[in-house]
Amino acid sequence: MLKTSLSLIIVAVLIAAGAADAAVTVTAAPALTAPAAADTAALRQKTLSLSAMVPGGGDHPIRLTGSEPSQYFDFALRRDEAVVNAVLNLTMTASPSLLAETSQVNVYLNGELQTTVQLTKALLGQRANVEVPLDVRRFRAQNQLMLQFVGHYQPVCENPANEVLWLSVAPESALKLTTEKLKVANDLSLFPAPFIDAAGDTTAPAVLPIVFAGTPSRETKEAAALFASLAGKLAGWRGIEIPVYYNALPPERHFVVFRTKDTDPDFLKDRPLPLGPAVTMADAPFSRTAKMLLISGTTGEDLNAAVLALADTKRVLIGETLAAAGTRPVKRAAWDAPKWLTETTPVTLADLAQYPGQLSAKSQSSARVTLPLNLAPDTWFTSPENLTLNLAYRYTRPVNHADAQLRVTVNDVLVDSENVSTAESRGTAKVTLPIASGALSPDASAAPAMKGRNALAMTLAYSRNFSEGSLTNCRSASLLPQQLEVEPGSTVTLSGAYHWAELPNLAMWLSGGFPYTKYADLSETALVAPKTISSGNLSVLLTSVARAAQATGLAGLNLTVVEDWTDNRLTDKDILAAGTLPEGALTDFSTRAAQELSTRLSKAVQAKTWEKTSASFTGNAAVTAAFESPFTSGRTVTMLLTESDEAAQMLSRRLADTSDLSSVSGTLAVITPDAVYSYAAAPTFTSGNLPWYRQVWTGVSGHPLLVSLAALLCALLAGTGVYRFMRRQVRGRS
């Protein structure tokens, strides 16, 4: 019955596809139709979760104590917006043992006290909602919010480390901002702002629409793919979604337009077209504040040249228009993505830092520095010595003969620790990072192991001993802030590792863009975008390219775009394709159906008849299917297939979120708005540079009985050889 119900539910989705109770609330003081979201008001509401602004915070509550009374929250504002109203919504629970009225929470914005919330009896021991208005005049481009807990449990002789001193801030606590859009100058020196602003809302992926006059030509699609890859690199870890519009204005926001002499959107018909490749920043129609980035050219080849010029980091951007032609960069070597550790040279921690000040930390008792540590998804370790950290650091010396300890963790798993000197204020350490021989582990809880994306943390923890004394012999304690400074020249060294993977593997593709990102410039990647591709499916393809660039930190400026499966350029390439699911692709939710779909797709590609077998449906599911390329052995084809435009929009949104789809595995996945179902539906192959003898050992290491039999066979052969040798020796003497 359960299986039948589940099948009915899933088939309905896949047809044609293949509370918080609050006890107290306290308030502390023309020819072209305009887009649907026209600029009737330039105000925007956004909510920033406090937990999301804490490194590693996630959905966990924030706990303030007597020994750790402060928590900092860093956030930024876009250059083209100003705050007109700001309210901090705190959902918190205070210890019932606190003294009412004298205990309090101080709220600071950029170092200036905003308000003090007194913890009255009504607020102790139960959840309470507190609204704190903030002074909008104190907001800057880079901002820091601080909560300071001042708790008391007795009038005199208190111990700051007493366990009754605590305040818990719930994960739903948030900073609610009302911002007004500002009009910025048409100046390319601002680029990538305002189109991609790294100082914007970092809690959600960026969104940058692209507009075409209609279904674009192959050359225009290639230019758009180059730009999407550049956008993914610029958006960084937050990710980016790239919606596509055909001859229509997107809802109120900044956007990009590709235009040529023969393909110009209706809303630009009266605007002169520059001669040759050009990039121009201009005001968007029907908007007081939105901008459009016009990528223009006489032909589609000019559009490619314009994007390449924009991506040239050596070129100075200034003024409204860049009239220049760029060229394709030299092909890069394998596995040399800027964001990945490589064996060519040690990587400094300064290179791993994502923002200024990341190598510095302050705290009352444990200063923590956290850095990303990324590896190529197919990295294969052979020894625990493959990955080492050479660390140099400075710190505040412990006082009164207290102890201090440096702890190094990877993914919150302890790697090493050592006591630091109380006589010095600097130290060094050589740490071997945790490695289990073999492939990277996709399991975040596996230890010791490394994943493709890791969090390297260095924490300096200080011991504190407090004595309350007595009413007649009161002893006071002063909590001095502690500071840890990691030297930028500290290095992480990768050596002696290989590259080896079983492909296709959707988990590798979604986490690191592999195998396409093996060459970070995508020089061995081909995109298949049919001549009649829908705007939704083109959006999926472009967002996928942007996601790959986000994983490598490099724009894939050597990619290739083709329009059909008969193109000879598909040979010796890893292929990424987007399209519509064929009719009847999934009629039953089962492993067998998934395997049949994977086989069907592979045969359709091999027969070069994919476009002839596609159809349009009205469901809301998508399928990602990967299999070995029928054109070149050892290469991968990944197909992104949707049932409808709604499904394409859903898949594009989920691909834009770099933390989403982490549960996908195998070779085929069915993706719905609420769930993901993975299958091992296609044969796999191996790829990499692992020596043959290690391949043999890898193949048999998972079969202990086979290893035992092989050992017995070797012993028997060796014994037989020795026996025969000795027999010959005896016969020779006689």
Report residues per predicted region:
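Bacterial N-terminal signal peptides
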Residues: 7-16
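Positively charged n-region of N-terminal signal peptides that target proteins for export
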Residues: 1-5, 703
